[in-house]
């Protein structure tokens, strides 16, 4: 998908169609690389997860495979840059914080350090890695924009087969990413308004909610002026935040149930997480680092709960494996071989 999307970027290919009332976008449109994903945010979060998996397998891989893992990491960073997904960048930041911190914590080079000093060093390494990923994304974005400007000045602008209107349209594609006027000064890209509308709906039925698939019919009937169904864009069928989704869909009862579940799972994981060493610890770290970016993405779009998406599948799969792994006794745990 990343390779296909990259070809679409440099070929300026895009497709904009409507299927059963749902807009389907492919390629490079509105200065963002959608690729073959229904939403570039999905692709960017998958890229963050793929980077973590490449790092996990890299250390124990043979040299030819190491080169492929490096190339893969570069491609995934490129996709996040071209997609201009802030959700993807936040997810990658969280994934690297978790992975680098936990990996460094058990590094043999830091074993001699005192606990406090080791902790500080691990935090610094994790933050450095996360910030470096942001810098890499920015470099890719800026350098690609400069290349496209060169391409326009030396090739497209002198193309006699293109009309002035076509050339002007090509000129608008020179920048990678949304510009400030694209989101009309709204840094949340409508999310704040959607969340506010969700709270309006929640107040009408706070205890049990209105159910997830009933947002639009309920709002049209009870709150026809709320932003969810009355705006200058489209009707929104989700809250673009998984926890606001729960609040509106299942009310206070749903929030209490989910909060209790999250707390119990976290206690179960971290009560046992640091009991393991070696490959089992690395394996658990990789699983937790897959869960972290998906959990972070839940703050910015509807994911995991009520959804049948690739991200939901990965989240529950990784969480299931992690819980099984950390709750198994050392004597019961199967030997995990290093990734090749």
What are these regions (language model features)?
Residues 1, 8, 47, 69, ...:
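Transmembrane alpha-helices of multi-pass, membrane-embedded glycan-processing enzymes
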């Amino acid at each position: 998908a990343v390779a296909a999307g990259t070809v679409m970027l440099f070929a300026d290919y895009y497709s904009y169609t409507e299927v059963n009332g749902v807009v389907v976008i492919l390629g490079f449109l509105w200065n963002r690389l959608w690729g073959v994903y229904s939403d570039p945010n999905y692709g960017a979060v998958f890229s963050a997860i793929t980077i973590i998996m490449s790092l996990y397998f890299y250390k124990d891989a043979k040299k030819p495979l190491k080169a492929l893992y490096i190339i893969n990491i570069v491609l995934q960073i490129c996709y996040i840059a071209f997609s201009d997904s802030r959700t993807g960048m936040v997810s990658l930041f969280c994934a690297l914080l978790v992975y680098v911190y936990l990996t460094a914590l058990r590094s043999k080079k830091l074993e001699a350090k005192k606990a406090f000093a080791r902790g500080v060093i691990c935090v610094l390494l994790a933050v450095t890695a996360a910030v470096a990923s942001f810098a890499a994304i920015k470099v890719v974005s800026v350098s690609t924009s400069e290349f496209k400007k060169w391409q326009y000045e030396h090739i497209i602008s002198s193309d006699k087969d293109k009309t002035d209107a076509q050339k002007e349209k090509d000129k608008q594609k020179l920048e990678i990413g949304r510009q400030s006027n694209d989101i009309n000064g709204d840094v949340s890209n409508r999310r704040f308004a959607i969340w506010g509308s969700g709270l309006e709906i929640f107040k009408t039925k706070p205890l049990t909610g209105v159910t997830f698939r009933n947002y639009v019919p309920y709002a049209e009937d009870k709150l026809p002026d709320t932003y969810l169904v009355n705006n200058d864009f489209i009707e929104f069928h989700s809250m673009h935040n998984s926890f606001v989704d729960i609040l509106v869909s299942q009310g206070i009862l749903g929030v209490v149930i989910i909060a209790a579940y999250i707390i119990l799972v976290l206690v179960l994981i971290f009560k046992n997480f640091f009991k393991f060493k070696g490959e089992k610890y690395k394996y658990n770290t990789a699983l937790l680092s897959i869960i972290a970016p998906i959990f972070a993405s839940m703050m910015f779009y509807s994911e995991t709960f009520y959804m049948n998406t690739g991200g939901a599948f990965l989240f529950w799969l990784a969480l299931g494996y992690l819980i099984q792994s950390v709750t198994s006794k050392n004597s019961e745990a199967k030997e995990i071989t290093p990734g090749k």
